[in-house]
Amino acid sequence: RQLTDDFYATSVNQHETSLDFKVNEWPDEEFTIPMVGEYNVNNALAAIAVGKQLHITPAHIKKALKNVELTENRAEWVNGAQGERILSDVYNSNPTAAKQVLKTIEELPTTGKRIAVLGDMLELGDASARLHASLAANIDPKKIEEVYLVGTEMENLQDALEKQGY
């Protein structure tokens, strides 16, 4: 059977450190992944679709997804010295991932301030300045109160944020 876009997630619920969702193919099953960012549901759906094609049961797929080992510093929660909760997504970042993480930060509930610390994204070639500056459109000062930038390429984002009055 050929997979189509008829395979999709429903009832997506984001928590502080995980996501729960259902899949239309198995509406009574709830899947959990130990990471934030609704974009990660699409990654999980790819794994679920492959599992389904290989006739792996939903129970086994659920267990594997719930226990997946994350790459260090990719959507990883870190505890700060004074009790801060830091979402670290600094390993080999790229514009698409950075935009998704900024969206996730804006959507996560918090009792404190949201602070973004962004460093240079490497290996972007001639498009580097434009791609760094493009992140400004994904930073809402009403939702992310402070932004700290590290690296020479991030000067492009700084210029773009200043033009927006940030």
Please report, for each region that a protein language model flagged, where it lies by residue.
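A short beta-strand/loop micro-motif in the catalytic core of glycosyltransferases
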Residues: E146-L149
